[in-house]
Each structure stands twice: as structure tokens, then as C-alpha cells.
């Protein structure tokens, strides 16, 4: 059997079908049935531009790795699946609401490139299986394909709109998982109930006597019957029960996911001392302990007297004052007990790769660290902080680099050149002047026989430089960071009244974050298009001609277009950019 090479992608024996059917509209499609006024309204809608600016730009080839190496049933259209995920999170729809929109909403169908009312691009099972494939691929390779879509779209948008990326800003927010908040004792009981469900009938009968008090009711109901003073004894009892079950079941159930979670809870909350099971104290537990059996990735953090269970999302966007609009350039998701400075240390490299001209990054005080100072110096990025973490020094020592290995150190009353010590640098101050200084008792310089000596290394120089960076900027560039709070608000808008996502787990949070980033960037571009239609004449022409280039790669597709209308292949781009403008 012969296959069209444009439609089917080969990687070894892998067969993958790209969705190009949307490039050729149906003769009896939606456009032919709508009155002229309604058709014009449809073509001016945000969903129509979503189709052009997002749907048509999704690189389906990136997803070919998700499918079989052998000839099999053709895959569902990937661009429709990815675009549906973006629309679902953008509009805060449930999955059921998404399919209702696909079936009955003309605007949603337009956004997905559906030209007729009869077709449905995929069923719910296919939609869920696609997300499972994404998760499996991420688990095996560490690559999030939705992030790749975001990076590809953003790269095109930055280039076409000529957005300056040399100045950017970054901030993070808490994304709480859609899980129940368990107390320690309730979590221990809940895991016993979950473990009992996977036991064989034989094992359920075997352990019925010791498990029956817990499985007859929910964990919350059991906990409700306990008095506060009974909690320590109950935890000790649970520890003995956990040890008995673990020793008896570990060989038979070691491959079960629920048992793996049970084992994790057992090792996190209990320890064996002198052959006796002991309950760990609260101080021995940390934010990385299991928060819920429904989300094994969630971590705990207390911030500003509020308790968070879930993940943390870090967002970076352009911030040059000359830009008429700014776009998100990077999104990172990690455990919420990860310090912002560590997140920045891991992400500044990829951000620099995506936007090589980056030379100034604005953050709040939580992002500063010694490792980051070294990384920023290596990448030639000026780190501007709007605040400084920790207490302010009573006597400041300003260190200025004169040349390689040569520094000038300035205190409130003296300025001296540095000398090289054995491992560090030192600055020697005149002791007579120091005696007259009212700040002498708080000075970090050490008193010696005939001088006062201040010891420092390069990290101290970089720290002082970072703290002073904001003072070296013109006034209009000192307050660039706060605007990213509005971007954070766009991400958190779909959260429920408790500040929780609809989803659970690290990967689903990553999909949410990158889908929302695509949506937010699209919204900004769309609003900018509405305000500057003339600017998009050339860029939309280039966007419009891409479908024709797609078709020209396949003689069969080109022939289909020419048969229907000899001029359609060449006139369609003009209509394309005209409608988008």
C-alpha cells in the first residue's frame, strides 16, 4: 500500500498521520450556509483568529513519538487534541463542557478547524488516552510536548512582532492541587482503607480482624470518634499495624502502585529503633512527605500564614519599556517547597537559550543567591532585585571591581584598595580614622593591632553588585517587575474559591501552566491585532501562505485544491490575512 508522504510521517517504521484536512474548506461547509453578515462576524471572532494563530501553527510532527511503530489505525488529529486542551483550560471548562462545545458551538468548531457540522475530531476516550500518552512520554523521557508547542508558538510570535527580549521579569505563584487536606492520623487511616481495596479475597479475610475497625467507615468518620488525647496512642497502634502489613505483603504486592504509596507513608512516618516501631516526631517530617494518596507529587509549604499543598509555577515574560506588548517566554513547574532562587538557577540557562539577547532580569528578593550570582555573571545577565532578602547591614561595605583580581572597598568614611590574602581578599582601613567613626562598634572589619581588616571573596562582591543594580538603572526601569503580578493573576483566574486547580499531579499542572501560557500570549497578540490591524498585513500574508506551502508539498493535496477552484490555492492567502486583520 502506498501512502502520501506529506500525510504520513515515517521514523523507521513509525506511521503517523498529520491533519491537513482543515486547509481545504468543504464546498457545503459552514461558510457556505451562513448569511454574509454572520460569516463576517464569525471571521472577526477571537476563535477564528485562534484557529489561524494557534491551531495552524501547532507542529504535529513533535507528537509522532507517541504513536505505534507499526501500521495501525490512524491517529486522531493531534492539532485538534492539543488545541482542545488549550481551549479547555483557557475557558475553565470541564471535559464534559468541552465536548458539548465541540458538538454544538459554532465558534469552538471554528477554533478547531472544523468546517462542517457532521464531523467530531475525537471521542472522550481518545482525548483521555492522548493525555495518558503525554504523561507516559514525560515519565520516560522528561520531555513535555505541550511545553514544546508553547516554545514553538512563542518563538514565532516574538519574531513576527519584533518584541525585544533583552529585558525580562520573573515571578512565581502557588498552584494548589485539587486534593483533600488530611491530618497525619487521617492520612495513615486512609492508606489502610486504600490498601484493603487491592488485597485479594484471601488476604482480606486474613487481615480482617485488624483492619475491620478502619474499613467499616471513612477515615474522617473514624477520626471523628477519637479524643485529642487518644491521638498519640492511636498513631503508635497504627505504626504496629503498618509494620505487620508491610512485612506480610511486601513480596506479593510490591508491583502495585497503591502498595508503593503505602510503603512511602510507612517509611515517612515511622522508624524502627531497637527492633521497636516508633512514630516520628512532627519535627522529623518535612514538606516533601505525602500530602494525599490522590496526588503523590504534591508538597507542603506555609507562606504568609497560609498552607499550600501542590506545586509552584514560575513565569518569565518580556519587559522592555519599548515593547507595545509583552509575551511569556518561559514557564516552569516544580514542588512548592523549592526555593525561588533554586528555580531561577535551573531555568535561567534555558531562558537564555530561547532568548539569547537577554541581559537584564528583574525579580523580587526571593530569587537572589550566591549560586545565581555566579550563573548570572557567567551568562552576562544583570540581575535586578526590587527587594533584598534578610536584614540590612548596619555598616555597608561597597566593593567595586577595578580590574581582574583588584577591588576597591568603600565604607562610610574610607575607600581603600584590596590586597590578595591566602584564600580571599582583604581591605585594610586606617585604625585612627576608624576610632572616630560612630559606627565602629558595628563594623564588619576586624580590629587588629595597627589596622582594621575586612575580608571578602568574589561572592561578596557579586552580592553587593546585585543589591546595587537597581540603583544604577534609570527611574523608568526600576519598577518593571510589579507588572508581572497581573500575569500571575491571569494564571490563577481559573482557580476555585479555595485557590485550587481542577487537576492533580505535577504533570497535569505542567500541562495546565503551559496551556494557559499559550492562551495568555494569544490573548495579548489578539488584542494587539485589533488595535494595530495595519501592522499585520505582511505577517498575516506570510501566515496565510503557509497552508499553500503545506499543500504544495503533496501533489495529491494540490490537485484536490486546483480541481475545486483553479484560483483558490493562490487567492486564499489574501483572504486569509484580510480576515485576520
What label would you give each PLM region?
Residues 97, 102, 116, 128-581:
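Anion-binding and metal-coordination hotspots
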Residues 41-83, 456:
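Basic, short loop/linker segments at the boundary and entry of helix-turn-helix/winged-helix-like folds
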Residues 62-68, 110-117:
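Short amphipathic helix-turn modules centered on a small-residue break
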Residues 69, 92-94, 136-137:
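N-terminal core-binding DNA-recognition domain of tyrosine recombinases/integrases
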Residues 80, 106-113:
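General structural concept
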Residues 2-44:
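N-terminal intrinsically disordered, low-complexity, charged/polar
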Amino acid at each position: 500500500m502506498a501512502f502520501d508522504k506529506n500525510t504520513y510521517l515515517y521514523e523507521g517504521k513509525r506511521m503517523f498521520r498529520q491533519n491537513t484536512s482543515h486547509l481545504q474548506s468543504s464546498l457545503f461547509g459552514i461558510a457556505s450556509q451562513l448569511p454574509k453578515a454572520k460569516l463576517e462576524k464569525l471571521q472577526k471572532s477571537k476563535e477564528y483568529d485562534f484557529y489561524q494563530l494557534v491551531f495552524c501553527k501547532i507542529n504535529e510532527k513533535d507528537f509522532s513519538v507517541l504513536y505505534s511503530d507499526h501500521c495501525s489505525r490512524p491517529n486522531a488529529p493531534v492539532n485538534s487534541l492539543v488545541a482542545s486542551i488549550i481551549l479547555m483550560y483557557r475557558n475553565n471548562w470541564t471535559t464534559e463542557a468541552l465536548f458539548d462545545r465541540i458538538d454544538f458551538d459554532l465558534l469552538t468548531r471554528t477554533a478547531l478547524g472544523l468546517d462542517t457540522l457532521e464531523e467530531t475530531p475525537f471521542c472522550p476516550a481518545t482525548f483521555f488516552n492522548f493525555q495518558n500518552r503525554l504523561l507516559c512520554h514525560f515519565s520516560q523521557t522528561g520531555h513535555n510536548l505541550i511545553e514544546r508547542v508553547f516554545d514553538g508558538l512563542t518563538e514565532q510570535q516574538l519574531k513576527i512582532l519584533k518584541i525585544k527580549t533583552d529585558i525580562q521579569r520573573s515571578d512565581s505563584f502557588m498552584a494548589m492541587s485539587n486534593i483533600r487536606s488530611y491530618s497525619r492520623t487521617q492520612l495513615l487511616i486512609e492508606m489502610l482503607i486504600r490498601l484493603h481495596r487491592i488485597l485479594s479475597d484471601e488476604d482480606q479475610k486474613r487481615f480482617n480482624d485488624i483492619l475491620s475497625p478502619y474499613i467499616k467507615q471513612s477515615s474522617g468518620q473514624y477520626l471523628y470518634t477519637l479524643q485529642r488525647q487518644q491521638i498519640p496512642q492511636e498513631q503508635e497502634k497504627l505504626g504496629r499495624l503498618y509494620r505487620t502489613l508491610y512485612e506480610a505483603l511486601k513480596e506479593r504486592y510490591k508491583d502495585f502502585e497503591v502498595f508503593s504509596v503505602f510503603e512511602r507513608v510507612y517509611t515517612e512516618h515511622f522508624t524502627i529503633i531497637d527492633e521497636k516501631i516508633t512514630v516520628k516526631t512532627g519535627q522529623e517530617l518535612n514538606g516533601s512527605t505525602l500530602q494525599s494518596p490522590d496526588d503523590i507529587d504534591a508538597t507542603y509549604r506555609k507562606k504568609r500564614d497560609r498552607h499550600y499543598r501542590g506545586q509552584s509555577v514560575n513565569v518569565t515574560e518580556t519587559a522592555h519599556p519599548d515593547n507595545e506588548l509583552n509575551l511569556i517566554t518561559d514557564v516552569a513547574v516544580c514542588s512548592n517547597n523549592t526555593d525561588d532562587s533554586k528555580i531561577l538557577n535551573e531555568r535561567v540557562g534555558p531562558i537564555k537559550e530561547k532568548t539569547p539577547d537577554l541581559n537584564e532580569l528583574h525579580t523580587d528578593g526571593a530569587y537572589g543567591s550566591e549560586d545565581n550570582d555566579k550563573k548570572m555573571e557567567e551568562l552576562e545577565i544583570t540581575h535586578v532585585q526590587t527587594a533584598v532578602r534578610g536584614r540590612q547591614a548596619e555598616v555597608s561595605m561597597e566593593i567595586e571591581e577595578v580590574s581582574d583580581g583588584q577591588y576597591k572597598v568603600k565604607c562610610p568614611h574610607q575607600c581603600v584598595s584590596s590586597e590578595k590574602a591566602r584564600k580571599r581578599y582583604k581591605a585594610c582601613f586606617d585604625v585612627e580614622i576608624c576610632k572616630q567613626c560612630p559606627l565602629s562598634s558595628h563594623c564588619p572589619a576586624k580590629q587588629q593591632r595597627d589596622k582594621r581588616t575586612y575580608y571578602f571573596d568574589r561572592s561578596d562582591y557579586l552580592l553587593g553588585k546585585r543589591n546595587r543594580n537597581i540603583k544604577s538603572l534609570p527611574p523608568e526601569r526600576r519598577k518593571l517587575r510589579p507588572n508581572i503580578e497581573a500575569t500571575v493573576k491571569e494564571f490563577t483566574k481559573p482557580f476555585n474559591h479555595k485557590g485550587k486547580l481542577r487537576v492533580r499531579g505535577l504533570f497535569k499542572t505542567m500541562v495546565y501552566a503551559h496551556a494557559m501560557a499559550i492562551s495568555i500570549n494569544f490573548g495579548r497578540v489578539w488584542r494587539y491585532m485589533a488595535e494595530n490591524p495595519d501592522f499585520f498585513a505582511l505577517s498575516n500574508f506570510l501566515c496565510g501562505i503557509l497552508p499553500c506551502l503545506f499543500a504544495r508539498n503533496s501533489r495529491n493535496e494540490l490537485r484536490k485544491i486546483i480541481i475545486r477552484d483553479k484560483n483558490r490555492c493562490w487567492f486564499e492567502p489574501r483572504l486569509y490575512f484580510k480576515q485576520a486583520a
